Amino acid sequence: FNTVAYDKKGKVLNGLPVDFSFTGKSFDKSNSASGLILKDGRFVGDVAGKYIVSAKIGNITSSKAVNIFQRNVKREVTTVGTGLVNDKHTSDFWVFEGVDKKDYAVTGTWGADGTSYFWDVTNPSNIKKIDSVQVDARTVNDVKVSADGKICIISREGASNRKNGIIIIDVSNPYDVKIISEYTKNLTGGVHNLFIYENHVYALSNSERYYIINIEDPKNPYEVGMFEIGKEGQSIHDVWIEDGIAYSSNWRDGVYLVDVGNGIVGGSPEKPVAFGNYTYDSGANHAAFPFKSKSTGKFYAVMGDEIFPNGVNANGLNETAGFLHFVDFTDLNNPKEVARYELPGHGSHNYWIEDEILYVAMYSGGVRIVDISGDLLGDLYKQGREIGYILPSSPNGYIANATMVWGAQLYNCLLYTSDAADDLRG
């Protein structure tokens, strides 16, 4: 809402302080109206109803009535196919197009025996386990595949020889994958997450910093750069790269935007340069995903929490907490947190954004699909933006009949998920 003030002669008065407020009444008599209005007059209603928005300057008030209706974005969500892992926890995954133009996936495992599985998902209603690789590790937390579908990188934690590092795998034939090489320099403390971008691997080292490794020749990888925030007690959980910008999630130190080839501040893989940062009070920044809104032109970093209030039960159900923070980075020098997606009773984990739709793994809350088009403001869950959800589980899972969704990825118009309790799904 915009206000214009005039004097008695009809001249516009600029710069006067305006106080905005609202009242409302829900269309649903069993509910109460709620919403949010900012100092600049932007208003959002959480609940369908009739609202009155008022602007006050001194003792003069002007009001306008507005009706808020439901977005009506609901869709049916159904499972097409399942690839079951029932003897260990499934961790992260990646779906990719192979060199033969068919569709494949790779999944890691957590707290187990260092196994990664490869799947044919060309027919998503008949997901087939086609090969596996076992390495010296307890956990293969992260797996990624190069854009050309030829190289897979898996992370290692808990290796018996304490070297950990990454394993480089030839997946040109996903039915017969071959280990090409390993790389352990500066990564012996364990690699929790990694990312592949333009012939480089960005690998976390002991959850403190990330090293940048050239894999142009996958038989002879070599280090070219490193990034750390340079603070005492620094910690990093994840890194994601898009358009030459790395988004590192650093727990209490929030997200860092780092030029690793975009050119915005002259950065490169050999010389990464940070140019943006945002922190928030919980100190639980676990993941970050960039989002450029097509409908508004605004640029966001969507930052996710990971919180286990009672610790982690490795072999049972877990209570989770936390939510997604939508931070407007349109002005890189003045980022502002403007919205949240919080599912009551469940915490966030990994997520994917495409075409103004958010696909978020909420652990025991399943996978939630959320409309994030238009101006984002306030509590997106309360505003009825949820398109649909699914609560995957299996009576034959590693944890029977449990839901603990780890991640989500949209691929070829299908949503794929991994669940720590049992499987890969599409």
Which residues does each predicted region cover?
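Feature marking well-ordered beta-strand scaffolds used for ligand recognition
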Residues: 48-50, 63-418
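Intrinsic-disorder/low-complexity peptide segments enriched for small residues
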Residues: 11-14, 34-36, 378, 385, ...
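Short stretches within intrinsically disordered, low-complexity N-terminal or propeptide regions
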Residues: 7, 57, 303, 422-423
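Short linear sequence elements within intrinsically disordered, low-complexity coil regions
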Residues: 25-27, 32, 176, 200, ...
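Extracytoplasmic soluble-region selector
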Residues: 1-72
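Single conserved hydrophobic/aromatic residue that forms the stacking wall/gate
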Residues: 416, 420-426
